[in-house]
């Protein structure tokens, strides 16, 4: 992750260079000293410097992601994270990760076309690890499908879903040869439930609720909860739907889920005995 923080990387290189220079000066001034233990100590010290800088970069990245996924500050997150799209990242997984997180922030703001454009422009280059390549494409298509679903673009969502299920089948076939404890699970439940709701007006609330409960990120909890609320309303369960929508508005009033929830609340017919708004 240090490649995402050029200043931190530059600082690490400077520290390493200074450290090695000091070791060189010490050996030059103490020619009688045995160089082997000095170099061993230097290697340990150098490793500590490098590891500490990598850990710092990792923590900085985690804090940035927390702003988006748990603090729900999409605008602040993008202000600091979006410029990383311009970094010359050689590691394909890191480059994709940056795009996935950025696209999630775009979606949180309702900027689905920009999210789709960002993800569609990324080509997974073949590597020696075919499974990793499929995993990368699976992540991209899953997000693209979700964007299309939130735009209510059924043809695109169905096309992405078909590709997603095909990728899932290939990945599961690869996992079949591995010990059971080492097998990965590839979930398409959220995409399937959302598409089912758009196509048929029905979705399994129980499945969606389990996805909310198993998710640790507040942003995703809220986004899934919006779908649950829509299902409740379609089932004429106004009480639960209204309750959930009010919670979403309270938690994320400035984000896309909160704004949609507010619109749905405003569009509800007045209850018996109440004056229309």
Model-predicted regions and their roles:
Residues 1-78, 84-86:
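N-terminal alpha-helical membrane-insertion module
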Residues 50-128:
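N-terminal topogenic membrane-targeting module
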Residues 63, 94-104, 136-146, 184-195, ...:
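"A position-specific structural signal for the A-helix of alpha-solenoid helical repeats
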Residues 85-92, 124-134, 168-182, 212-216:
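Flexible helix-coil transition and linker loops at the boundaries of alpha-helical arrays
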Residues 94, 132-139, 156, 177-187, ...:
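Structural signature of alpha-solenoid helical repeat junctions
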Residues 118-127, 133-158:
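A membrane-cytosol interface segment of integral membrane proteins
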Residues 199-277:
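Long, non-transmembrane cytosolic or organellar matrix-exposed soluble domains/tails
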């Amino acid at each position: 992750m240090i490649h995402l923080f050029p200043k931190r990387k530059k600082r690490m290189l400077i520290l390493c260079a200074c450290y090695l220079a000091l070791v060189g000066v010490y050996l030059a001034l103490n020619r009688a000293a045995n160089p082997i233990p000095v170099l061993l100590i230097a290697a340990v010290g150098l490793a500590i410097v490098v590891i500490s800088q990598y850990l710092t970069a990792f923590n900085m990245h985690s804090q940035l992601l927390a702003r988006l996924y748990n603090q729900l500050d999409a605008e602040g997150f993008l202000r600091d994270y979006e410029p990383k799209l311009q970094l010359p990242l050689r590691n394909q997984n890191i480059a994709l990760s940056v795009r996935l997180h950025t696209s999630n922030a775009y979606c949180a703001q309702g900027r689905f076309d920009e999210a789709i454009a960002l993800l569609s422009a990324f080509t997974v280059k073949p590597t020696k690890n075919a499974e990793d390549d499929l995993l990368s494409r699976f992540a991209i298509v899953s997000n693209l499908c979700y964007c299309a679903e939130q735009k209510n673009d059924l043809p695109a969502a169905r096309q992405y879903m078909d590709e997603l299920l095909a990728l899932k089948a290939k990945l599961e076939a690869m996992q079949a040869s591995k010990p059971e404890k080492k097998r990965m699970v590839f979930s398409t439940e959220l995409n399937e439930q959302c598409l089912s709701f758009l196509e048929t007006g029905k979705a399994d609330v129980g499945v969606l609720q389990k996805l909310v409960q198993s998710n640790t990120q507040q942003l995703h909890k809220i986004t899934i909860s919006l779908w649950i609320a829509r299902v409740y309303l379609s089932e004429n369960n106004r009480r639960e739907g209204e309750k959930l929508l009010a919670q979403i508005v309270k938690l994320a009033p400035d984000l896309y889920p909160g704004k949609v929830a507010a619109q749905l609340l405003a569009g509800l017919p007045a209850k018996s005995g109440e004056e229309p708004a």
